[in-house]
């Protein structure tokens, strides 16, 4: 599955009696979190864990991060598989003993980046393999895309690092405009500057 884009949620909400966003990889038996979508303002959260499921947001050293901080999304609980059939290396990489003190069992590293929002819901921000280092800063390309997707003038966005001249890497975002107008790069940069650090704009 893919993330539920804000513009699709906006289009669906008036047409359905209830809109639910469910998140979960096959390795955790399909769904792990759920959220009833009430509005399409901002990014669409993936919600809270379902029963018998635990969610952990971990840093690069497998420490839990506080709310608001981006980390790797890991899932534990009764629905978590024990590993991959005949793939011991991949199993060892993705299925680990729970590193949180007092918590037992296996957890699954999803490969997704996420953070816990102020209201306690989870926000998925893309893949960990979508993370780059540019000019000494670690940049989450998925977070840039998420912020662009929240703008009314943007239907869809993709952020990349492009190197036109050897050694001159830069952030580039490609967008599909929403509606008939096309937002200027100045307007987009100004909007991103309100929510992202300078090195990500």
Map each language-model feature to its residues.
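Specific aromatic-rich, kink-prone transmembrane helix
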Residues: 33
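Short gly/Ser/Thr-rich phosphate-binding loop of adenylate-forming enzymes
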Residues: 1-18, 52, 61
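AMP-dependent adenylate-forming
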Residues: 18-21, 36-201
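Short, well-ordered alpha-helical microsegments
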Residues: 5-6, 30, 141
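Conserved lysine of the Walker
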Residues: 27
